[in-house]
A protein has these predicted regions:
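ABC ATPase nucleotide-binding domain
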Residues: 67, 117-124, 135-136, 236-238
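ABC nucleotide-binding domain "signature motif"
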Residues: 101-111, 253, 262
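The feature captures the beta-strand-to-loop junction immediately N-terminal to the Walker
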Residues: 80-82
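ABC-family ATPase nucleotide-binding domain "signature/switch" substructure
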Residues: 89, 122-125, 130, 141, ...
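Primarily ABC-family ATPase nucleotide-binding module
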Residues: 20-75, 111-113, 151, 158, ...
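ABC ATPase nucleotide-binding domain helical subdomain, centered on the C-loop/LSGGQ "ABC signature"
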Residues: 22, 104-106, 114, 139-182, ...
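Cytosolic ends of transmembrane helices, especially the final helix of ABC transmembrane type-1 domains
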Residues: 1-21
Length: 288
């Protein structure tokens, strides 16, 4: 998971792109907002991974083997499995952070071309487990990349409410102007994660990948966040890489990964019946 530790999310791609040797460069939120108006449109039907296989550089072993997934727009999808099973690598394929060894990403029945990658990434948000925050105030971290005079403060508050951190921030003497310290040192792990989630909501991207992004939240806060996500309109598509069963119970489809392959998929109740390994995960209530 080294690449995950280095990756700070779609708004913070510079380090990750240099590691995985993509030619595209990071753009600020302001540039992305302008760019989105003219080019690749938000998908209306499906995001499809077709026969995706992937081998990391200098490795003889395939990290992914013939992955086929169709994600209907507006659904909540979960990837589960042990560390190294392929779930994060699959999410990286959806985000075009890794070039597949074979196979293709299809958006609304149209294969995504190399020239479309930046456009596609501008439509997505990635919320990692390990959050990188600016040594600045809360409003700058939520509206990442925007000049202060371009920030919509009302929209920042709306995003903070959706991320279940409104009460805390509103109780602070300086509220949105509170400095979070170096990499968010003045915040708890759960608070940092919620700031990152608020950032994704502020960008108003409709495809959001959450890579163990609720791991530091207590059960009640996580439950409230999942409820808030469920109440969003059907234009939002969520992909959860989860560490707790409670995160994925309400998902429309759960994909179980094992050794770079999908070993089972279906709704929660369906997997309870047909997957022994999923039942074992449920009994432990944690995904190792």
């Amino acid at each position: 998971r080294g690449i995950t530790d280095l990756r700070a999310g779609i708004p913070d791609l510079e380090e990750a792109l240099s590691i995985i040797e993509l030619e595209e460069k990071r753009r600020s939120l302001e540039t992305i907002t302008k760019y989105k108006k003219n080019l690749l449109k938000m998908p209306k039907n499906n995001i499809t991974l077709e026969n995706i296989s992937y081998k990391y550089p200098n490795s003889d072993k395939f990290a992914l083997k013939n992955i086929n997934i169709k994600i209907p727009i507006g659904q909540k999808i979960a990837f589960i499995g042990k560390t190294g099973s392929g779930k994060t690598t699959t999410a990286n394929q959806i985000l075009c952070l890794l070039k597949p060894s074979s196979g293709r990403l299809i958006i609304d029945n149209k294969p995504l071309n190399l020239s479309d990658i930046q456009d596609w990434q501008s439509l997505c948000s990635y919320v990692p487990q390990s959050i990188n925050l600016l040594n600045s105030d809360i409003i700058s971290n939520v509206a990442y990349g925007l000049n202060e005079n371009k920030i919509d403060e009302n929209k920042v508050w709306e995003s903070i409410k959706a991320a279940q951190i409104y009460e805390l921030i509103n109780s602070l003497p300086q509220k949105l102007r509170t400095n979070v310290g170096e990499n968010g040192i003045r915040l708890s792990g759960g608070q940092r994660q919620r700031i990152a989630i608020a950032r994704a909501f502020y960008r108003n991207t409709k495809i959001i990948v959450m890579d163990e992004a609720t791991s530091a939240l207590d059960n009640k806060t996580e439950s409230n966040l999942i409820k808030a996500i469920s109440n969003l309109n059907k234009n939002f598509t969520f992909i959860f890489i989860a560490h707790r069963i409670s995160t994925i119970k309400e998902c429309d489809c759960i994909y179980e990964f094992k050794n770079g392959e999908i070993s089972a998929f279906g709704k929660y109740d369906e997997l309870i019946i047909k997957s022994k390994s999923f039942r074992e995960i449920v009994n432990k209530d944690i995904i190792s």
